[in-house]
């Protein structure tokens, strides 16, 4: 049995069946995770107050160097406004960025008595595919994320607020959203984290989750 499995589960671990929710957003130079460059990555660990309400931790974010031979679609750069080769980006190689990104996530998984992190994203399959493709390319070890399961805030927002677009869902949830700041991995990750916490907390307030149900997660 692993050390994390021996550690008593925190209320957060019990809330999500041993999974630690971590919001991830990426900015890329295209849609193909195998061929197109990863340019930015940001992660926001989700924590829980004593009363069971969720809140986002500060983001951990990196600009990323395009990997050797990466495809870069000009249309994608025009959409995000990112110049991949601007030296002021202080970009890191993929493997270095992911190793640093994963370190605090593994620490939080351990401290909460969780088994794994689970990626939370807005259209999460996209972010998950780029994160895992980059980890595979860089031979990054000890990836803390579940290899295929995710929590998708586009789906959750459609249920809770009747809208799937991040900016509109945030507005409906009462979360300020600046379209001029959008398409930055860090900004979008923070707003996705706020949206996720808003939906889960609202569900709790409506009686959809109580502390009595925590035993079901064991």
Swiss-Prot record:
The protein's required cofactor(s) are namely: Mg(2+)
Question: Mind telling me which GO cellular component terms the entry cites?
Answer: cytosol
Residues annotated as binding Mg(2+) 2 are 25, 27, 183, 188
Kindly name one Pfam family recorded for this protein: RNase_T
Q: Name one GO molecular function term.
A: nucleic acid binding
Say which enzyme class the record assigns.
Answer: hydrolase
Q: Which InterPro entries match?
A: Exonuclease_RNaseT/DNA_pol3, RNase_T, RNaseH-like_sf, RNaseH_sf
Residue positions of the active site: 183 (proton donor/acceptor)
Entry EC no(s): 3.1.13.-
- Report the record's Gene Ontology biological process terms: DNA replication proofreading; tRNA processing
Q: Does the record's keyword annotation contain Nuclease?
A: yes
- Give site residues, Important for substrate binding and specificity: 31, 79, 126, 148
- Which HAMAP family does the annotation name? RNase_T
What is the purpose of this protein? Trims short 3' overhangs of a variety of RNA species, leaving a one or two nucleotide 3' overhang. Responsible for the end-turnover of tRNA: specifically removes the terminal AMP residue from uncharged tRNA (tRNA-C-C-A). Also appears to be involved in tRNA biosynthesis.
Spell out the subunit comment: Homodimer.
Q: Per its record, how is this protein called by name?
A: Ribonuclease T
């Amino acid at each position: 049995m692993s050390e994390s499995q021996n550690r008593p589960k925190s209320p957060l671990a019990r809330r999500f069946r041993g999974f630690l929710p971590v919001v991830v957003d990426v900015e890329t130079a295209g849609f193909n995770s195998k061929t197109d460059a990863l340019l930015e990555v940001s992660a926001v660990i989700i924590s829980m107050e004593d009363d069971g309400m969720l809140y986002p931790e500060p983001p951990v974010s990196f600009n990323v160097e395009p990997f050797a031979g990466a495809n870069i679609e000009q249309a994608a750069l025009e959409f995000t406004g990112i110049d991949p080769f601007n030296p002021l980006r202080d970009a890191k190689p993929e493997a270095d960025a992911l190793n640093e990104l994963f370190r605090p996530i593994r620490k939080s998984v351990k401290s909460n008595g969780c088994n794994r992190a689970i990626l939370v994203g807005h259209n999460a399959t996209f972010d998950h595919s780029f994160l895992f493709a980059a980890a595979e390319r860089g031979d990054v070890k000890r990836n803390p994320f579940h290899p295929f399961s995710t929590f998708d805030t586009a789906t959750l927002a459609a249920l809770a607020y009747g809208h799937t677009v991040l900016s509109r869902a945030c507005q409906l949830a009462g979360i300020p959203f600046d379209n001029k700041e959008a398409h930055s991995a860090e900004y979008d990750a923070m707003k996705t984290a706020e949206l996720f916490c808003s939906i889960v907390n609202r569900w709790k307030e409506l009686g959809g989750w109580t502390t009595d149900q925590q035993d079901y997660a064991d």
